[in-house]
Design a protein with these regions (language model features):
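Detector for small/aliphatic-rich hydrophobic stretches
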Residues: 7-15, 19-176
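Extended hydrophobic
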Residues: 212, 263-279, 391-423
Length: 423
């Protein structure tokens, strides 16, 4: 009788499932652990067995920015549920899905490539290698990837080689149904999110055969920190209609955002490499309708048309949010269907196609804390398997539901995008 198996990936965590006998297939493979290791819960680090090759990289250009912006907008708006505080990391999810598509073929690959902005996987691998290296060159942002294979599994080396070459992934072999392995995975996640996400998975899964995990950790101080004199207590009017008095941080910023339906600002972090951006829909624009209207093109236009050196009187609440979600329904809305169907999914470049691997889980966890010192944010994905006259100061008081982002100021791409509906 065939046994149902699962692959898990991302922090985003993505879980692949499979109707499978022990793995085999074409191409060179990584060998199994011993029965003794499997029974004892030993985690073997196989990374040193795979030398990292220079597979090439490509700096972010107009094509990549358009693809990444489109993916970011779709991921956010399709995951948002009316009135619910939401926070996703397009960077974490894009990295995780780009990693897993290296194991896909046929229509499964076509759907993944289309959802990831239309770039073919070889091009995306090169873009992601350069982009992640670029983002993590400073001290503010850390990106980590890992592939965990079950001790009973022989994974194709071509897939693992790409994981190491393009994503600097660590490769582990362990009995994934063991509680000790779950503890090891959570320890890896906690370490690589600086403790902001202590766990990505709660229970051992006896059907799991592989987990691909991405972790992102961001921490930066404001370029101009707030002082105690900048703190004011104001009312925040939540989505539910309730009002709550909370601490607002008051400042004058110099980048004004406007798209006809919302106004906002950008506030730089120290060194100017990243910025916090917020958009407040006009009084007559419903937050749900505004989020539904977002697209990659609209996001790029908001930032490309930003009015610099235009004063903005900003009042922003301190806030903290934790978010956890399964993203399969969201990804289906984005056009990825076959990957989640045990009969249609084709992950034959990950394992033998006859093993019937499919994605069974996509777990995404995020965290953010914004205060007068700066911002801390983290994400984990597990996939199983202009010259102007002096204007009046523009007021932007975030005293009702608003959209916010942490933005890479070089590409204007959001690393995190969320909506705060309650305080």
């Amino acid at each position: 009788m065939k046994v149902k198996k699962m692959l898990a990936v991302f922090m985003s965590v993505l879980s692949l499932a499979a109707c499978t006998l022990p793995f085999s297939g074409c191409g060179k493979i990584i060998g199994n652990a011993s029965d003794k290791d499997a029974k004892s819960g030993v985690v073997r680090n196989l990374t040193e067995n795979i030398s990292k090759n220079d597979s090439g990289s490509k700096a972010a250009d107009k094509e990549f920015k358009a693809a990444a912006a489109s993916f970011s907008a779709d991921l956010f708006k399709y995951n948002y549920s009316n009135g619910k505080t939401t926070l996703v990391s397009p960077l974490s999810m894009l990295t995780a899905l780009a990693l897993v598509q290296n194991g896909a073929e046929g229509e499964t690959l076509v759907q993944l490539e289309r959802a990831l902005g239309g770039l073919d996987r070889d091009a995306l691998n090169k873009y992601m290698r350069a982009y992640c290296d670029f983002l993590s060159a400073g001290d503010e942002l850390k990106i980590a990837n890992s592939v965990w294979t079950d001790s009973s599994v022989e994974a194709k080396q071509a897939f693992l080689q790409k994981a190491v070459d393009s994503y600097s992934a660590q490769i582990f072999s362990a009995p994934l149904s063991s509680k000790k392995t779950v503890s090891s995975i959570n320890s890896w996640v906690k370490k690589n999110t600086d403790g902001m996400i202590p766990k990505i998975t709660e229970n051992a899964d006896r059907d799991a055969v592989m987990m691909l995990i991405n972790a992102v950790a961001f921490e930066a101080k404001w370029e101009t920190p707030y002082t105690n004199d900048d703190i004011e207590k104001l009312e925040f009017n939540s989505y539910s209609g309730k009002s709550k008095k909370t601490e607002f941080m008051c400042s004058t910023e110099s980048v004004y955002l406007s798209d006809g339906d919302a106004v906002g600002f950008m506030k730089p972090y120290k060194n100017g490499r990243f910025a916090f951006a917020a958009l407040l829909p006009d009084e007559d624009v419903n937050i749900d309708d505004y989020i539904a209207s977002l697209s990659g093109e609209k996001l790029m236009k908001i930032f490309s048309s930003a009015k610099k050196n235009e004063e903005v009187d900003v009042k922003m609440p301190k806030f903290k949010a934790e978010y956890s979600t399964q993203l399969i329904d969201t990804l289906k809305k984005m056009g990825i269907e076959d990957a989640f169907d045990r009969k249609s999914a084709d992950f034959s470049s990950l394992i033998d196609k006859n093993d019937g691997a499919y994605i069974g889980t996509v777990m995404h966890k995020t965290f953010i804390e914004v205060d007068q010192e700066g911002t801390r944010a983290a994400a984990a994905t597990l996939v199983g398997i202009s010259k102007m006259s002096m204007p009046a100061i523009n007021p932007v008081c975030l005293n009702r539901p608003f959209v916010y982002m942490i933005v890479d100021t070089e590409t204007n791409l959001p690393l995190f995008i969320g909506v705060q509906t309650e305080i």
